[in-house]
Amino acid sequence: MLLRRVIPFAQPIEKVSPGARPSLVQVGRDRELLRLRAKIIHSAGYTVHSIFPDEATATVRKVSGGRVWVFCHTLEFYELALLAVAIRHSCPADRLLRLTGLNDVQQPQGLFDEWLDSVRGVDELLQVVGRLAKQSALGQ
């Protein structure tokens, strides 16, 4: 009889308490996509909050800085621009990641810290999130 072998996603290098986990907020319109991405990012050791665009402005005002924001390709440009400007103004230590889609128009530089094609793999997403989380922790 063969034993089952479990292959984990990415494991955090060191165990952290839930309060010490880096915080990530993802904003999008597709509930299922947000749920799946949250599971993947959470498995790598992050606290993930998934919200819709209409909830984002209230979230910016509620929580202090030091987070990574992930903007899904399902958002419209005007939503992206308004949210990015609000976050930059209220929480300058936060880092912003834009997941791009096939039909994205050229967007102004400086709104986001990083861009990532939404069809890239999980490993690349986690690398970019990790890099931005370190930058946001240093910026606090």
What are these regions (language model features)?
Residues A44, P92, G110-F112:
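Short, structured coil segments at secondary-structure junctions
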Residues V48, D94-L96:
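Hydrophobic anchor at the start of a short beta-strand
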Residues E55-T59, G66-A93:
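Conserved phosphotransfer microenvironments
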